[in-house]
Amino acid sequence: MNFNPIFIPIVLSLLGLLYMFFKAKWVKKQDPGNEKMVSISSAIKKGALAFLNAEYRLLLFFVVIASVALFGISLVVETTSWMIIPAFVVGAIFSGLAGNIGMRIATDANSRTTQAARTSLPKALNVAFGGGTVMGLGVAGLAVLGLSLFFMFFINQFMNDGGSFYDNMTVVLEALAGFSLGAESIALFARVGGGIYTKAADVGADLVGKVEAGIPEDDPRNPATIADNVGDNVGDVAGMGADLFGSYVATVLASMVLGNYIIKDMSDYASEQFSDPFGGMGPILLPLFIAGIGIIASIIGTLFIRIKNNEAKEAQVQASLNTGNIISILITLFSCWFLIDYLLPDTINGMKFFGEGTRDIPSQNIFYSTIVGLAVGYLISAFTEYYTALGKQPVLNIVQNSSTGAATNIIAGLATGMKSTFSSVILFALAIWGAYELGGFYGVAISASAMMATTAMQLAIDAFGPISDNAGGVAEMSELPKEVRERTDILDSVGNTTAATGKGFAIASAALTALALFAAYVTFTGIDGINIFKADVLAALFIGGMIPVIFSALAMESVGKAAMKMVQEVRRQFKEIPGILEGKAKPDYEKCVEISTNAALKEMLLPGIITIVTPVVIGFAMGPEALGSYMAGVAVSGVLWAIFQNNAGGAWDNAKKSFEAGVEINGKIEKKAVSYTHLRAHETARNLVC
């Protein structure tokens, strides 16, 4: 009996999920704290689950409608099987499940992190990062498992139909694309809905509570404080989990599609079907193997994240996270050498380069492409950390500019976000050019797969942020001793940066994934290139560039509408419920949670529908070349807007933290009561851009 190599990534994904269950059990075994802490944590979890359940019920209708549409497509498109439908449905379920796993463990870990902080900072870090690890491994494990199982099933179903290897594999990969489509569809709505919820609650809690009433962040007297903490979970945990799940799956799938074209190129060159010890599928299997080994590398990397000093500051905590990240990257890189040597021929003969004929590419060039991808993943995090971290020049510049009021605060923050696009875009440009020269579009796709291989680690670091933020909220609302909040604030401050770097990684992954998908699209449609001298193609390019702008506008408008209702509700409660500000009466937390939930569910639909419908209309009305131009416009504009918004928001966030800790402006130490204009400028601008 021949060994089927597809079992290797299946086993690796199951190992990741097994470790996830072990880590989740360990987190839940930790002390959740006193009765008040447990009550607050339960309220946050209840609100988050209520939102997710309502969101998933709404998305169920979308899944049903999309499934019917896919069935219709399968009847008229020869290469599309009806089996794309179960793949689509399972992809949607797995995407939702990935976000749900992360959200549940995050809400379990928050009070446990707070309780651990009563003992020591190192223990609090272990609990918070343990919760993040569960989320990261859940996303990566489910993605690799789902792709591998469906690929194995479709191989058995379609590869013996009598056609050519290339034609049969095209049917397999088109059916597998349903899994990616389901994942990306849920990710879109989860990210938008979670983001609207988060920012609406944030504005209400901060502007009325902190600025107008002058009470601290996460103070139990603030009616919006539970909604604010719920938002951290549904947006930055569940939303981010679904987001990276979709990007992860899309990257691996695009690489597999391009691997099929590489096999066709080699077969055409040799005038016979390419063969290898893996059923002639080595180039297709490589991205799955890289993803699988990345899970193990991430697990090993998490073991190195620890601090020993209870007096450690932000720099030591950040250094610990960076160490674990670097170790996971190096293990992935080392493994890629052996995987490429194992799965690819020594030379890829006849690889097509658009407009340049064919080249013979040594397999080590593909390994060099993985170096490019892993370097991009690390450097984009480093660039984001520089622009958003406490004590770095960009944040200090915003702090200093706040001395003259709100206007200069906003100007400095906007300028920081805009400047930050330079280094990231230059990095992307060099990476795209370098990976393409090394291995064509397949090299670009494999570089993206290598970068995404450490998704489990990146998500663990990212989820650590909102867990730490919630832990600080639980400490404040439970009125614990000052040193507990100081310890959670250290983790929260680092978490602000890791949240920004996590989004930076998501942006980088989206950029390289978009290019890999674009390459797969161009190759699949058979168009020779995109000629912008054609009027319809140029028009589509401009439309594509406009979509991220209008998407951002709609999202911000939605946040504004929801935030206005939240602000009015918080003001109403302060006015109509006697004793709230004196701590003698309990606010109506559920009302604020309800406002954010209803607003997010209602307002997420229009941006999502525009994003899905526009390319369909462009494709049918203007043709495949114009659609390719549209995709290029979306990719370029979207990356620029995402980098700007992410880094401006992260820098403002840590500028606020600087004020709260006490900073020197013009030789004078100023703290969180620095002035109404400082906080007003920060809160308005940050919530606007984030």
Predicted regions and their residues:
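Hydrophobic packing and interface segments
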Residues: 1-680, 686-689
